[in-house]
Amino acid sequence: MTTVIEELARRLPDIDPSSWARRFELGGVYLGGRETTPDSPITTSCRLEYYDPLYPIDKADEYFPAFRSEMILLMDEDIGVAWKPAGLPTTAPRDQRLYNFQRYLTEHLKRPVHLPSRLDTGVAGLLLFSLSPRMNRHLQKAYDKKLIEKHYIAEVVGDFTPEKVEIRSELARDPRHPILRRVVSAGGESAHTVVQKIDAYKRVETSYSLLQVEPLTGRTHQIRVHLAAEGFPIVGDPFYNGAMAPELRLISYALRLYHPYKRTMMTVELPRSAWPDWLVERVNLSGPFSISYREEKRHEGCSIS
């Protein structure tokens, strides 16, 4: 009977045989939809999948951002807020299982960590996590009821108008690629995003707008697709025709939610020490900005049982 490693070597002869041990260590090999080992036997009914990494496997430690304890900004026995750097997956992707923020947090804290929402790999910023089953349940209900505010900062080319807009549409997979999304007239998932212009400014001869963006639903690439559909793709977003830049200029900047066990509102903003260079440059050009939060009455009923 053929084994997984024998079949991979037969089908992928261009891959150095000596590299397979490291490739299995990283992950990315699946048999029947589950991670597998080199010596696992293959039956005729099993599907074998291999996801080739897009980075040098011998330099993965350099490719992905490293974890530092100061990335945890606040934490109690139930909940925490951390800063995830751009370039690090929130959870394990299909091509590898070693380098992701959830794994780093779990290993650092030596306890299970639940992530009620995720950030795209290219997005930096605040990430909420829970540490107890009771908080897991609360956060899930709070997200379902849209009681957790997540505010992003985005930079786009041009003078964004109107000053504030609510975007509602349906999003579905783009047939060109399984990761991409697009706006559809019917048959997709409903998506709702509130966009407010913070400032307009120029770098050299190009006009830019700084936007505060609050997604009220949590669809894949929701902010990126909605802004692109409005004619203002995010700077540094090659997936949706954004202007060229070395990074995606979208960050998770602020969180606001009710802590049910301390009976208080939590408001967390990204500390300046974690700001990307493009945001620091903008503040140096135009001065400080502030986030507009929802009215307090919008948070009535936050104590979910």
Q: What are these model-predicted stretches?
A:
Residues 1-305:
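RNA pseudouridine synthases
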